[in-house]
């Protein structure tokens, strides 16, 4: 994200060097659904080029490879009492590369070694390589929880517990697209009640005349309320509902059935449920 030449936007969100592995992780995830060798051969050159870039971009610091400079998108931290955003190896960078390199290895490529993120001293998943102070505890972004969702590599129980603490600390507010992310995260953590709470919040009626709305909600046509509107909120909540159904993270209020939800490896699931329980 961002254009280093003539960059006029804030470093709080513009100079992020990690879009490529995220996009390629999505391509590999698609491959795992269809397992088509022709498709795999089509995407392999992109993985080779991206891998070559990060082999060159990573630098050694304290005996470990890190990204630098980088940011945790749109967030800031406190360092010696000063608000800052540029740093090295934010957790999202680490988590993206951890998965990207794993995908590369499955494609037969040799990669550097990157360790998975670990819980901080407060039991949460840290947002940065160092435990900086927070400038906005309930920030709308949850970038540092990529290792939980949408990452395909299952997180450890320790990381899942740390993610729960992180989400509770961030709260249940945010823009519509932020609520979408949180629905997906709670669904991956198999907490259907918290996911459903956010879905209902996202479906709260918002007047079309609203100029700006930070708490989610939907216009009468069900567009995500974030003027003019942001489709991220709509797609994010839909993805979260699919994740809830896949993981049987069902709130007590739900009864119904699903048919043909796709899984990796060409598999699919169908089942009925009543009062939040599979039957």
Regions found by a protein language model. Name each.
Residues 1-41, 45, 91-247:
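Active-site core of glycosidic bond-cleaving carbohydrate-active enzymes
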Residues 19, 51, 63, 90, ...:
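Structural beta-strand/beta-sheet cores of well-ordered domains, especially the beta-sheet scaffolds
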Residues 25-27, 34, 69-71, 152, ...:
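Active-site proximal loops enriched in glycine and acidic residues that flank catalytic Cys/His/Asp
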Residues 39-49, 64-70, 197-201, 249-256:
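Beta-strand segments within the central parallel beta-sheet cores of soluble alpha/beta enzyme folds
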Residues 49-107:
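Acidic/histidine-rich catalytic neighborhood
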Residues 58-59, 88, 138-140, 245-246, ...:
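A general structural signal for short secondary-structure junctions and capping/turn motifs
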Residues 73-89, 217-230, 256:
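Short beta-alpha connecting loops at secondary-structure transitions
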Residues 82-86, 251-279:
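Surface beta-strand/loop "capping" patches
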């Amino acid at each position: 994200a961002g254009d280093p030449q003539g960059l006029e936007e804030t470093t709080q969100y513009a100079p992020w060097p990690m879009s490529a592995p995220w996009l390629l992780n999505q391509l590999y995830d698609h491959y795992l659904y269809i397992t088509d060798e022709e498709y795999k051969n089509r995407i392999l050159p992109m993985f080779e080029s991206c891998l070559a870039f990060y082999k060159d971009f990573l630098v050694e610091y304290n005996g470990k490879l890190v990204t630098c400079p980088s940011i945790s998108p749109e967030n800031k931290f406190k360092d010696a009492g000063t608000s800052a955003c540029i740093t090295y190896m934010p957790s999202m960078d680490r988590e993206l590369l951890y998965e990207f390199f794993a995908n590369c290895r499955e494609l037969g490529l040799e990669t550097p070694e990157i360790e998975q993120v670990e819980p901080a001293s407060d039991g949460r998943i840290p947002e940065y390589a160092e435990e900086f102070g927070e400038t906005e505890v309930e920030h709308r972004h949850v970038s540092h929880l990529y290792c939980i969702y949408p990452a395909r590599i299952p997180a450890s129980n320790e990381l899942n517990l740390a993610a729960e603490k992180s989400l509770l600390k961030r709260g249940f507010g945010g823009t519509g697209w932020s609520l979408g992310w949180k629905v997906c995260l709670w669904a991956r953590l198999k907490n259907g009640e918290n996911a459903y709470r956010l879905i209902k919040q996202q479906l709260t009626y918002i007047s079309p005349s609203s100029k700006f709305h930070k708490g989610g909600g939907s216009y009468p046509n069900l567009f995500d309320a974030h003027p003019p509107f942001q489709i991220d909120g709509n797609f994010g909540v839909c993805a979260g509902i699919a994740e809830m159904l896949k993981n049987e993270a069902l709130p007590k209020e739900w009864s119904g059935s699903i048919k043909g939800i796709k899984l990796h490896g060409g598999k699919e699931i169908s089942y009925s449920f009543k009062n939040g329980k599979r039957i």
